[in-house]
Design a protein with these regions (language model features):
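Conserved C-terminal structural/oligomerization subdomain of aldehyde/semialdehyde dehydrogenase
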Residues: 21-24, 53, 338-467
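Structural signal for hydrophobic packing residues in well-ordered secondary-structure cores
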Residues: 5, 38, 42-49, 64-72, ...
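Conserved active-site and cofactor/substrate-binding residues in soluble primary-metabolism enzymes
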Residues: 29-32, 36-39, 52-55, 59, ...
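ALDH superfamily catalytic-core signature
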Residues: 28, 222-353
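Short, surface-exposed amphipathic charged segments that create phosphate/polyanion-binding patches used
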Residues: 205-208, 249, 310-320, 361, ...
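N-terminal Rossmann-like NAD(P)+-binding subdomain of aldehyde/semialdehyde dehydrogenases
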Residues: 1-121, 149, 291
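Rossmann-like NAD(P) dinucleotide-binding subdomain of oxidoreductase/dehydrogenase enzymes
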Residues: 109-252
Length: 467
């Protein structure tokens, strides 16, 4: 379907020599105007879908993986430098998971049904040109992940990257484009504008050559995409709760919660944001978090922290002060007069369930712990804190009934039992990896299939049935 099985034309021209001027004024996929970026991607996609076989896609995806692996340390360092957020060593781990565990064309399996009346095939066909909006929290990781997934499905991509990460994003995109061309693929299979803006997104939404809108970011961005009138895949905000009940392995819970909540300074939408510990588990969990290296705040220090890192929002609630998002715990603690070594990756505070730290998605290594009177109360509190995002939640328990009851109550896209929530996207857990978790639009843990159309071909009158 759509050229997925077509042979590459004989005598196809070799990749252009280094220094050859790209078409439409672009520089290895980076354009000054969004319309040029879309036009170049549209031309590339027509070539890609018509003239490249699945084995060609697989070969080029492997070239992308090799290219990205060679830049992991460089891009991880540059993200920290440009965005001012997160931890270098954790970004290296994120990159490697994205590179190694994002599925390619191999997941585009064909469904076939044969019966008395004939044969039916359903296959995955490309949408065409996809607009992909990427976040500042995972800039190059999302470009790598989306590039592999989207071009594996036969699409091309026009990225609108986050302005705070535009330099490293452009470097990443240009390197991947070079790898694609050197492996025999078309120029400009992935493009972007040098200066990303929301106006560019509006222009792409209005451009008939863009057939699918995809975005990884906050709720406002997803709502903007949904108003575009086009097919949308949206990955929105989360505020993932964790429940630790009295049957849990408390040592394991302390280790994994510390690991997950401090990972990349908690800027990931799927990272643990608040904990509800039941009864006697509460004191033990806080003790285990301290043993891992967390700094436990006093009540007075907690209130100082609220004033420092949160601010009122227009809806009467609280939101993170962007100055402190993704900063090291030691830096945040120093600002309220608490001196800890740089090895301290997490601050912990014991608070009531209606505390601002519980209800606001703070995206920094400050973890509130609520002591719940019962498992039922913990579930109610956790569901309220999750705000109906249906994003991510986790539980530490040996009680299967508790695991099941919380899963049914919270209804999240990702649900992790007895591990850090990053295991839910393949970072330290089974299953494939993605940086686009499409909870609001229902695609879930996206892969190449998510960015394809289902097409059906039927041969009737009993044709091809051999039994």
């Amino acid at each position: 379907l759509s050229g997925m099985g077509a042979s590459a034309p004989a005598g196809r021209p070799a990749a252009p020599a280094a220094g050859t001027a790209p078409r439409s004024g672009g520089d290895r996929g980076v354009f000054e105007h969004v319309d040029d970026a879309v036009q170049a991607a549209w031309e590339a996609q027509r070539d890609w879908a018509a003239h490249y076989r699945l084995e060609d896609r697989q070969r080029i995806v492997e070239a992308i993986r090799r290219c990205a692996r060679s830049h992991v340390e460089e891009w991880s360092r540059k993200i920290v430098e440009e965005t001012g957020m997160g931890r270098y060593e954790d970004k290296v781990e994120k990159h490697l998971a994205t590179i190694n565990k994002t599925p390619g064309p191999e997941c585009l399996t064909t469904d076939a049904i044969s019966g008395d009346t004939g044969l039916m095939l359903e296959e995955y066909a490309p949408f065409g040109v996809i607009c992909s909006i990427t976040p500042t929290t995972n800039p190059t990781e999302t470009i790598i992940n989306n590039t592999i997934s989207m071009i594996s499905g036969g699409n091309s991509v026009v990225f609108n990257v986050h302005p705070r990460a535009k330099m490293v994003s452009a470097e990443c995109l240009q390197a991947l484009n070079t790898a694609i061309v050197e492996a025999g693929g078309p120029e400009n299979l992935i493009t972007m504008t040098r200066e990303p803006t929301m106006e560019n997104v509006d222009r792409m939404a209005a451009n008939p050559k863009v057939r699918l809108m995809s975005g990884t970011g906050g709720t406002g961005m997803v709502n903007t995409l949904l108003r575009s009138g086009k097919k949308c895949i949206g990955a929105g905000a989360g505020n993932p709760p964790v429940i630790v009940d009295e049957t849990a392995d408390i040592q394991l819970a302390g280790q994994k919660i510390y690991e997950g909540a401090s990972f990349d300074n908690n800027i990931l939408c799927f990272a643990e944001k608040e904990v509800f510990a039941v009864g006697s588990a509460c004191a033990g969990l806080i003790h285990q978090l301290e043993k891992q290296g967390a700094c436990l705040l006093s009540t007075a220090q907690t209130e100082q922290m609220v004033k420092l890192v949160l601010q009122p929002n227009p809806k009467g609630g609280w939101e993170a002060n962007k100055k402190w998002v993704g900063q090291n715990a030691s830096k945040i603690l120093a600002a309220i007069g608490v001196q800890v070594p740089d090895s301290c990756r997490l601050a912990v505070c014991q608070v009531p369930a209606d505390h601002p730290f519980v209800l606001a998605e703070q995206m920094m290594p400050v973890l509130p712990v609520v002591c719940s009177a019962s498992f039922e109360e913990a579930v109610d509190q956790a569901v309220a804190a999750e705000h109906g995002n249906r994003h991510t939640a986790s539980i530490f328990s040996k009680d299967v009934d508790h695991m099941t009851r919380f899963a049914r109550a919270v209804e999240t896209t990702i649900y992790v039992k007895n591990s850090a929530t990053k295991a839910g996207v393949g970072i330290g857990g089974e299953g494939h990896c993605t940086m686009t978790i499409a909870g609001p639009t229902g695609e879930g843990i996206t892969c190449a299939r998510s960015f394809c159309r289902r097409r059906r071909c039927v041969l009737a009158e009993g044709g091809l049935r051999i039994v």
